[in-house]
Amino acid sequence: NEFLPKNRLIVYTEGRNSPREEYRSNGRGNVQQMPIIVLVDEISASASEIFAGAMADYGRAVIVGDESTYGKGTVQIPRGLADYLPYFASQEGCGMIKVTVQKFYRINGASTQLKGVESDIVLPMSTAALPIGEAEMDYAMPYDEIAPAGHYVKNPHLARILPELRRRSAIRVAGDKDLQYSKWFIDYRRRVTEQNTDSLNKEVRRKEDAELRRIQRANDEERKPRYAAMAEQDARNFTIYRLTLDDVQADKLPIASKDDEDKYMESAEDPEEALEDDVDYPSNLDPILREALHIVRDMMDLR
């Protein structure tokens, strides 16, 4: 509603025994002209996929993150099992089941089921190492398509600049030590998952664990001075505001402080658990958020 004009189609639902239903924007549209990045990963599901799909179909936003989202494109309703018992039977403890009755369909006619929403720019997300998503589920419903909405118009601007956005992002990712480490760790986790075996030899396991900890410690040590320099540069280049549910209605957003960050800090009692968590991201911007900021800058530069 904030990103589209009034009465724009957002998503269809359609089922075997139910008519097509349309869901449209109410047209508040306070940020219709600003460049938008939608960050997604393989855990982004259902409503977040509907949002990402609509923004992509209208050419309103660049989708950034994992190769695709989760792929949960079905609608369920609860059915009480007591309704199926004999009239005078006890209904105590009958419970209920969720029955799939419809699918979601994007404006372009594609279902979000199974395939999800594909990213325009793929980044090395931590979730990429995990075998998750609707496609990994047993008996998942298939992907399908219906006729696209005949009256929607996609803004062609993002499609024109997308090749250049991808080129610039790829150059930055190739030179970003944090994102390259993420790519290494994704490949490592995939190898371990595909191998699907663990040695029963205690010494072998100890050597494997020690090598992984060595790599993690070396990565942490490399990051500390680099992150300190990045934080100083951020202080010169950025003004970072705090935005929480308490601040949404405020006339002016407060400046973010270190105290705000400390509220969300994680603590680890085990020194080994502290690996990779004891080096704070500069300005609370992880590598994915930082690259997303660069992409937004590119979008503004190419307008």
Give a label for each model feature.
Residues 1, 53, 290-298:
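A broad, structural surface signal
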Residues 106-296, 303:
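Conserved functional hotspot residues or short segments at active or partner-binding sites
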Residues 1-146:
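Conserved acidic, small-residue-rich alpha-beta core segments centered on
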